[in-house]
Curated annotation (Swiss-Prot):
The keyword Transcription regulation does not apply. GO terms for molecular function: dynein intermediate chain binding; plus-end-directed microtubule motor activity. One of its GO terms (cellular component) is nuclear pore. Its main location: cytoplasm. Belongs to the dynein light chain family. This is Dynein light chain 1, cytoplasmic. Keywords: Cytoplasm, Cytoskeleton, Dynein, Microtubule, Motor protein, mRNA transport, Nuclear pore complex, Nucleus, Protein transport, Translocation, Transport. It comes from Debaryomyces hansenii (strain ATCC 36239 / CBS 767 / BCRC 21394 / JCM 1990 / NBRC 0083 / IGC 2968) (Yeast). Pfam families: Dynein_light. Signal peptide: none annotated. GO terms for biological process: establishment of mitotic spindle localization; mRNA transport; nuclear migration along microtubule; nuclear pore complex assembly; protein transport. It is found in: Cytoplasm, Cytoskeleton; Nucleus, Nuclear pore complex. Acts as one of several non-catalytic accessory components of the cytoplasmic dynein complex that are thought to be involved in linking dynein to cargos and to adapter proteins that regulate dynein function. Cytoplasmic dynein 1 acts as a motor for the intracellular retrograde motility of vesicles and organelles along microtubules. May play a role in changing or maintaining the spatial distribution of cytoskeletal structures. Also a component of the nuclear pore complex. Homodimer. Cytoplasmic dynein consists of two catalytic heavy chains (HCs) and a number of non-catalytic subunits which present intermediate chains (ICs), light intermediate chains (LICs) and light chains (LCs). Component of the nuclear pore complex (NPC). NPC constitutes the exclusive means of nucleocytoplasmic transport. NPCs allow the passive diffusion of ions and small molecules and the active, nuclear transport receptor-mediated bidirectional transport of macromolecules such as proteins, RNAs, ribonucleoparticles (RNPs), and ribosomal subunits across the nuclear envelope.
Length: 91
């Protein structure tokens, strides 16, 4: 992990470990390259759809509520700094 990258704080996940690690890496890349939450989410969604097939949903922000249905084995919720990341596959 580079000096700019922050350690993600995992809150909930049912992802395989290697997929979780890759999502953490991609999320740190997104935070380093984009400042607008929508741009971070867009980058992650496109990368995940390409890597793991459609259809991924990505929510990034400082304050939101959620109640979602997801495919088993394809859900993660974590923080990087003050940003929360809710990422799941459905559909």
């Amino acid at each position: 992990m580079s000096e700019k990258e922050q350690e993600p704080i995992l809150k909930a996940s049912d992802l395989p470990e290697e997929m979780q690690t890759r999502i953490f890496e991609l999320s740190n890349e997104a935070v380093s390259n984009y400042k607008i939450e929508k741009d971070i989410a867009t980058y992650l969604k496109k990368e995940l759809d390409q890597l793991y097939g459609a259809t991924w949903h990505v929510i990034v922000g400082k304050s939101f509520g959620s109640y979602v249905t997801h495919e088993q084995g394809f859900f993660t919720y974590f923080y990087i700094g003050q940003l929360a990341f809710l990422i799941f596959k459905s559909g």
